[in-house]
């Protein structure tokens, strides 16, 4: 399994990263996405995570282990060639406040973006 590790900031620094995949390949690469805040790794264990890719119109649920976001590249992510800007969306549902116990609040934060490119697959 090939692992690609990225550090993605919540403060959205200007520097950009790039991940290149091949059309039709899936299950053989894992993205390890460390979410940082103020330059320090943030424990995201209490969040739900999804990789969102604008341009490719893809949203993929991710796993979280030891406070780090992991995604084994699924078939849907490499179904077609193209480029997009990707980011991790973290969401956390919390119960209502003391004033309104019936409400449910969802807090959402996003990381900086990175370029995700899916190259054309090799044709037989």
Region spans (language model):
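N-terminal assembly/attachment segments of tailed bacteriophage virion structural proteins
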Residues: 1-123
């Amino acid at each position: 399994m090939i692992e690609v590790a990225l550090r993605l900031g919540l403060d959205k620094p200007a520097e950009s990263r790039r991940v290149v995949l091949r059309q039709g390949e899936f299950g053989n690469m894992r993205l390890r996405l460390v979410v940082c805040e103020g330059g320090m790794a943030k424990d995201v264990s209490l969040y739900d995570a999804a990789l969102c890719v604008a341009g490719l119109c893809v949203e993929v649920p991710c796993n979280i282990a030891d406070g780090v976001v992991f995604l084994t590249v699924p078939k849907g992510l490499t179904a077609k060639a193209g480029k997009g800007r990707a980011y991790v969306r973290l969401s956390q549902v919390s119960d209502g406040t003391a004033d309104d116990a019936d409400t449910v609040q969802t807090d959402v934060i996003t990381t900086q973006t990175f370029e995700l490119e899916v190259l054309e697959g090799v044709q037989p």
